[in-house]
Amino acid sequence: MQLIIHRGTHQIGGTCIEIYSRKTRIILDYGMPLTAPGGKEFDETSLRGKTITELIKEHVLFAIPGLYKGQDPQVNGILISHSHKDHYGLLKYLHTDIPVYISEGACKLIHVLNVFTHKQSHISISKACIVKHKASFDIGDFHITPYLVDHSNTNAITNFTVTVIPAKAGIYRP
């Protein structure tokens, strides 16, 4: 198992972690950054009208093959820890054929929050796979167990235990 932390080690927000093996690739969160380069507050409206290629060049999105719309999907699943935009805010750019593993409450809240955002900023999860507390599931080579806890919003997952079948490999805590 290999791990790439694309964003989230030196700042709060904008979390994006990639875990992969020879056969399986998963993404843990794909959040909107809270700060722009230079330290100013990130302005979501700065994304409007830009292509995926432009956003990769600006380091808002990451060059992850097979993750985005218009590409051949090469990612087996996306795990969303909770419904804060710094954990899910860039989902709208991702290929809609890739399953999104998320708690029921978080999925519903993201849908409801679209009422309060500009239409171009709406997040739609077309392939939601609802996860439940301590109900393990497999994505390719990985065995995953979500742990839901109280947070500042409903059905937050604070830990995903990700193991390579059959050996335990690591824990993700957003």
Q: Language-model features: where?
A:
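An N-terminally biased module of ancient metal coordination in phosphate/nucleic-acid-related enzymes
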Residues: I80
